[in-house]
């Protein structure tokens, strides 16, 4: 449906431009952002072409490399320490909705209808029909994303996602290049038709979010927003979920829309489950490692430290042996959760956009109408209405 660009010369151009601009780094934050952006683009380019694009002399710029790494480590520690300080609030916030939400979802997954959806599979959608569906949705719900879609098609800026371990479980990703103030969108090949449409909306919504943020702040701060905010996935899921609802209201591939939406909600439940575990994980262990931790190790560490507080016996052999990360658990919990909460309330969403930067702050969330009680009520009502119909 969308021809993915496998010519990565544009990435090479961006890499060279960042190398030329290394001397512009005049602060620790700029060094961190330049280094992180540079390493991401280099990694993608190398995975895609098996060629190292780095200028060795430039790559050894000590200020950018060492100050950038040092600052990134500092930002990471701040993010982890803030999570540890507010872990009880995360635990209370997520648990207020998690159990009832997961019960509703699991009941639907156990139904005959979901079994029918699963066995039916995804429909084949022609290129023309797919484009018509997208443009109709853009016109009605998010015209700015539609303009981005036209631009990315015209400039051939939908790149094929190479095999990068960091993104191995994702169908797409968006990298914000603060130096050129541009976004690069990567999509996996062979994504099924309706899933591809929703994926395009998700990733281009990231682009719109970055552009909107950059219009009100510096490019460096825009990158920092993407690095540290627990809410950077909310705008993407907000538009993606509205797309599913648009399909349902207009009776467009209803079964496929429900199946794809449910798959995203299952991912959200898994992320919330991981976030609840991290909120009980020993602080010292989390400070040492917050990325790619075996889930079994997290559970066992919790059981060792809090055995007397947990009356239920757990068998770690029942846990799928997968690696989990704190940042992903946070972002992919609040992203779908807040999208579900606000998708019928544009005024609330606009208020949320004003506070989406920075760290988790339950007082700010409550002030605009996103207290844990309000989120719980809206998500459960939305879930019951949705699953009650289908």
Stretches found by the model and what they are:
Residues 245-324:
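Long, amphipathic alpha-helical stalk/connector segments used for oligomerization, subunit docking
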Residues 180-200:
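Short pre-active-site segment immediately N-terminal to the catalytic Zn-binding motif
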Residues 223-257, 264-267, 335, 368:
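Post-HExxH zinc-binding segment in Zn-dependent metallohydrolases
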Residues 194-198, 210-238:
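Post-HEXXH active-site segment of zinc metalloproteases
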Residues 56-184:
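Contiguous, non-catalytic segments that form substrate-binding/exosite surfaces or channel walls
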Residues 201, 205-209:
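Short active-site segment of divalent metal-dependent hydrolases/proteases
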Residues 73-88, 108-111, 293-390:
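C-terminal, non-catalytic "cap/extension" segments appended to globular domains
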Residues 1-93:
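N-terminal helix-rich structural modules
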């Amino acid at each position: 449906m969308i021809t993915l660009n496998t010519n990565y010369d544009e990435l090479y151009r961006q890499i060279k431009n960042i190398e030329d601009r290394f001397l512009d780094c005049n602060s620790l934050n700029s060094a961190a952002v330049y280094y992180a952006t540079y390493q991401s683009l280099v990694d993608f380019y190398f995975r895609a072409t098996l060629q190292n694009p780095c200028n060795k002399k430039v790559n050894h710029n000590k200020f950018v490399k060492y100050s950038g790494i040092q600052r990134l480590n500092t930002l990471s520690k701040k993010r982890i320490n803030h999570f540890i300080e507010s872990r009880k609030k995360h635990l209370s916030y997520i648990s207020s909705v998690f159990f009832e939400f997961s019960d509703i979802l699991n009941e639907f997954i156990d139904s005959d209808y979901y079994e029918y959806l699963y066995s039916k599979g995804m429909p084949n959608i022609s290129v023309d029909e797919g484009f018509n569906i997208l443009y109709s949705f853009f016109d009605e719900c998010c015209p700015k994303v539609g303009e981005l879609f036209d631009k990315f098609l015209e400039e051939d800026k939908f790149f094929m996602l190479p095999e990068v371990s960091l993104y191995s479980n994702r169908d797409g990703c968006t990298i914000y290049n603060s130096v050129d103030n541009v976004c690069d969108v990567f999509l996996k090949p062979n994504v099924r038709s309706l899933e591809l449409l929703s994926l395009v909306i998700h990733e281009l919504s990231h682009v719109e979010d970055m552009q909107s943020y950059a219009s009100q702040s510096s490019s460096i701060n825009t990158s920092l927003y993407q690095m540290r905010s627990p809410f950077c996935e909310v705008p993407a899921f907000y538009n993606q979920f509205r797309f599913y609802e648009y399909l349902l209201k207009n009776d467009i591939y209803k079964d496929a829309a429900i199946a794809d939406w449910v798959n995203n909600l299952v991912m959200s439940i898994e992320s919330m489950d991981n976030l609840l575990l991290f909120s009980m994980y020993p602080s010292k262990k989390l400070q040492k490692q917050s990325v790619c931790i075996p889930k079994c190790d997290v559970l066992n560490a919790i059981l060792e430290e809090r055995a007397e507080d947990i009356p239920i016996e757990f068998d770690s052999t029942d846990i799928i042996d997968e690696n989990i990360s704190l940042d992903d658990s946070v972002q992919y919990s609040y992203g779908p959760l807040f999208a579900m909460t606000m998708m019928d309330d544009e005024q609330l969403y606009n208020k949320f956009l004003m506070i989406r930067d920075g760290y988790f702050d339950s007082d700010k969330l409550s002030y605009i109408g996103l207290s844990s009680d309000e989120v719980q009520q809206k998500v459960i009502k939305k879930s019951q209405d949705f699953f009650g119909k289908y």
